[in-house]
């Protein structure tokens, strides 16, 4: 209903006219996204990839952004996103009044516009989706599947065990956790108004008309504060990620957190386990990438970080972008001068 990905009957009691109006506008935006960003960015990035890359993607700071992950890695079979945002409770839509349904769908259109129009999602929009009748994160994920021609076939909520294995929540657990609200993961964020049972999800989807096995993708999203004081002490999450190696990675619009010492655990995980990464300037600074055996290729223009960040790393990036080739599309943040830019970080060729 929110993603308008098929013609399945609406839940009983929902106003079909309101949903029809919503889907008309959303479908229009899907078309624009496919005709602009997907057609331009996806083949460009594909041409930069070496053969034989892993099909397992890890996207830290990827709140709501499955759509860009599928554009960047259309060959992916498994995608893990992690961010401060919780997945959300889908059950509240049942029996919602027409007035509230209209307002909720308007909110989803407004908060998803950054991803669909500007290939970027503002923090404020991600926060808004943490409260209300329609869960923002889940909605964005379903919209991403619709844009890329996938149909969801399974939705489960989960937690990680200490060894990194996955434990799916049972109906009994969902009921038992009903009144235990999800934890606020950052004091400046908006607190979720739903149960902690809906922190993390697993979505399985299949390409429309495709083979249920060969054309299947698994997406897992984890509500996670990725700083060293939280992610750094979460053995279950760290072991889950280690079990996925080797991986390809991406990040964008990540507030330059990978530049900071307080996020060294997630940065080191990427450097130890990835073979290829696509990012904007919020990716990994050359100081760390070069030491770990990576080479970096810059595209577009970069003169200064969009947000305040390390002067030394800014200087390193200015050098890296000095002779960069042009970039015609936006990939995450613009720089301080509103220039488009993109960074490829890949394992250096083995010495002969």
Residues of each region from the PLM?
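Non-globular targeting/processing and membrane-anchoring segments
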Residues: 1-112, 195, 202, 207-352
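Short, thiol/selenol-centered motifs that function as redox-active sites or metal-ligating centers
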Residues: 63-74, 90, 114-142
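Thiol-based oxidoreductase modules, predominantly thioredoxin-like and allied folds used
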Residues: 79-128, 153-183
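Active-site/pore-lining binding-face segments in mid-to-C-terminal subdomains
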Residues: 143-148, 152-228
